[in-house]
């Protein structure tokens, strides 16, 4: 992310997000069913500006032990919306090289709820928990953007998607310096949203054709209702005559 911003000044900001698969346990030891957890850089709060019920999202994402949860997650698992101060135990696995072999080692970490996101508000994204993403964890993705990482670019006023995309693929100095392989493509978030691609779990997916069809049906029903109203009104008027 830092490399791209330095190489291309039209990129105003970049937010990196990682799909973090972990088991969640409450302070009581009770295991919480699957929830979508994403580790994100603190500027997530600035780029997406989700509505909050409580807490400071940016400060929470700066805190390695802080976690932000959604309203629906809090209500479903705690029976109330404001659960600031509650603790969650996140259990995951990390790979370490030992005796020439990669081994999975279980790791546990306690997080404190420091922000509540109002997921009733409109958003392109879907998640249950947001936690801090250390810069060291996404060092590889600064240039490759792979391994379940999402990179969201914010362009400045003079920035254009097509021009930046061309630069990314033609700037030999940048590509050689960071060993870029293959073609890099940029997609507007709204385009991904309406693509109907169910494989992108972090971004909500809507089928544009289905939305148009539903809208057309709604308009047709409204038109029919209007005609029926007019016919009934005319019939009553004729009866009075």
Where are these regions (language model features)?
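Membrane-helix interface segments
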Residues: 31, 160, 208-209, 239-241
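Mid-to-C-terminal secondary-structure elements
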Residues: 38-54, 66-206
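Glycine-rich loop motifs involved in handling phospho/adenylate chemistry
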Residues: 58-62
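N-terminal membrane-entry
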Residues: 201-221
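Short amphipathic beta-strand/extended segments in non-transmembrane regions
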Residues: 1-54
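Intracellular coupling helices
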Residues: 227-241
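Structural preference for long, well-ordered alpha-helical segments in enzyme cores
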Residues: 1-4, 90, 167-171, 216-219, ...
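Short, glycine/charge-rich beta-strand/loop segments that flank catalytic centers
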Residues: 15-23, 63-64, 87, 92
């Amino acid at each position: 992310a830092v490399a791209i911003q330095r190489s291309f000044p039209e990129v105003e900001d970049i937010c990196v997000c990682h799909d973090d698969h972990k088991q969640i346990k409450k302070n009581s030891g009770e295991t919480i069913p699957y929830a979508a957890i994403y580790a994100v850089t603190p500027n997530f709060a600035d780029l997406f500006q989700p509505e909050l019920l409580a807490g400071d999202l940016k400060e929470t994402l700066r805190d390695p032990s802080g976690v932000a949860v959604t309203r629906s997650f809090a209500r479903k698992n705690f029976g109330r919306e404001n659960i600031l101060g509650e603790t969650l135990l996140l259990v995951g696995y990390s790979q370490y090289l030992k005796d020439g072999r990669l081994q999975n080692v279980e790791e546990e970490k306690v997080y404190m709820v420091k922000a509540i996101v109002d997921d009733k508000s409109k958003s392109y994204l879907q998640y249950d928990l947001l936690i801090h993403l250390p810069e060291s964890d996404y060092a590889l993705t600064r240039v490759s953007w792979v391994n379940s990482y999402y990179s969201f670019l914010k362009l400045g006023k003079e920035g254009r998607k097509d021009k930046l995309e061309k630069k990314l693929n033609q700037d030999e100095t940048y590509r050689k310096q960071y060993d870029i392989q293959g073609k890099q493509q940029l997609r507007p978030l709204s385009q991904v949203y309406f693509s109907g691609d169910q494989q992108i779990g972090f971004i909500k997916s809507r089928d544009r054709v289905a939305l148009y069809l539903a809208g057309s049906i709604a308009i047709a029903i409204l038109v029919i209702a209007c005609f029926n109203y007019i016919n009934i009104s005319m019939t009553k008027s004729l009866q009075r005559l």
